Amino acid sequence: MNISNYYWHFKSAIPPKICDDIIKYGLTQAETMARTGGYGDKELTKDQVRDMKRKRNSDLVWLNDTWIYKELHPYIHQANKAAGWNFEWDRSESCQFTKYKLNQYYDWHCDSWNKPYKKEGLDNGKIRKLSMTCQLTDGSEYEGGELEFDFRNYDPHIREETKHLKQAKEILPKGSIIV
């Protein structure tokens, strides 16, 4: 898909107190091993866990609380319009509150699939069009964790592959959002 804006950001949009409240709440919820989309909810073998952890090694909590969506959704709507995407959307998947311990990571991945979801419930038949990241902790409080985008609009015969990568430094301050 050709679009003129690959992402839209809001610097320090969410107040620090709300960020702290989300963190405090997320830390009280039961966590699970984070998975990538291809592994679903099925029981994994040791080999499957090892393969998955090559791409993603972190823990997460699923949050779908109205008070959190009320803070985040206005920015998604605003970005969708301001960036000129104008996607139709009527709901969000559960938020992933991800916990990274020392040396954990989430490597390169695409946030959408080429086919609609085939599962029970409200996501059935839908495709993720928009993804959002909210920086709950100030970027000065940890090392690593850079959010990079791969726009895939490069020709390896013309320029180096790394020249198409964009690091989203706009969202380092606490409370910043990128859609």
Feature locations, PLM:
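Fe(II)/2-oxoglutarate oxygenase catalytic core
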Residues: 1-177
